[in-house]
């Protein structure tokens, strides 16, 4: 991590994600070693909010999570931010209510990847219209080789995406794309971001062509 920070410079944003994999003792050791690496955020360094609260006693690095338990976050003082997909919260309207509650409680929020172009268009609009979201949101666009919208898949330029300006969400459902993706799902099953069916046993190289 120190080598990465040195290579990208002090000003580049660096976020980490352990996907709840570390034990509390391991996380303590890791965070102690990278405390001076200017880490913007560490996502789910441990498996529970309770462990995260104990970890907070040993590190000032901000924590985030995909688990939308605001009540427990307020009680324990961690995580600092929620990173949530709109479908988890039940759609745009419920997401806006959740963000408003986060703001009232002083807990940060940014968006997890919208996956398809429809979900991504939704979170682009919400991010643009919601002042409480002031950190860059996540995306998995580099993994996408197809989409269900005529305008997709989205391709960021210099790490930025414009907000769609057409009516509604600003994107158009592609019936052909939907059929194509449906047939692929039936044939290959749930999409695996890591497995490349063209190269069994090897990880996909990013970005996908």
Q: What is each PLM-predicted segment?
A:
Residues 22, 52, 141, 195-196:
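Residue-level signal for alpha-helical context at structural boundaries
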Residues 6, 57, 125, 179-180:
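Charged/polar, solvent-exposed surface patches and flexible loops
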Residues 34, 102, 130, 181-185:
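Alpha-helix boundary/capping residues
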Residues 38, 47-62, 68-168, 172:
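Shared catalytic-loop signature of beta/alpha-barrel
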Residues 24-26, 50-51, 92, 177, ...:
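Active-site-proximal flexible loops/turns
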Residues 1-55, 59:
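Metal-dependent enolase-superfamily TIM-barrel catalytic cores that perform enediolate-based chemistry
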Residues 169-209:
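Extended hydrophobic packing segments that form well-structured cores
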